[in-house]
């Protein structure tokens, strides 16, 4: 998990030193017992990592680690953030650390909510604020499309590998975000969308954002999960409808 990965990186500083760590060294890390230390020590197979790298190269996907300048500082402080993320697009350290606001909400939304999402995205991007969302149907896509039309910067956090477009009808939007923003995922190429991945994805949306605006959402929705993560991360959360 992310907690163990961060503990390993904190102790050994880089993946190469983790790879060559002795069993006794692994045991010294808090949260790693004998069983887990043995698993880490015995699972030293580079073939899987090489396959991921090949797939990334094939699909023009880049990798950021928690030690990179483009990894957002506002997200680094949380222990449940991945130490590695995959991305496509045009991030810079300045862009990744400028003010950002998440606009999230229902897939099936009212006309009023749709217009609110569009108006918010335009007003915020006018101020140079990054729009963060999940490229889902409804509020997400309305906000991100409006941001791009207004020549703003947007980050789409996906719940699958970046070689897959989900939902499939958002191929054009995905291409536009890659050219004028950033596509981001903790999942390597080839990982298909699964229901369990989207709530986890929402924690990254929350961590990347200084504020979270829920335009319209039903009980138990992904947007409210994002809002809950935001509150846990001490972000400003605004619920409009």
Predicted regions and their residues:
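Glycine-biased, small-residue-rich flexible motifs in mid-sequence functional cores and linkers
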Residues: 65-241
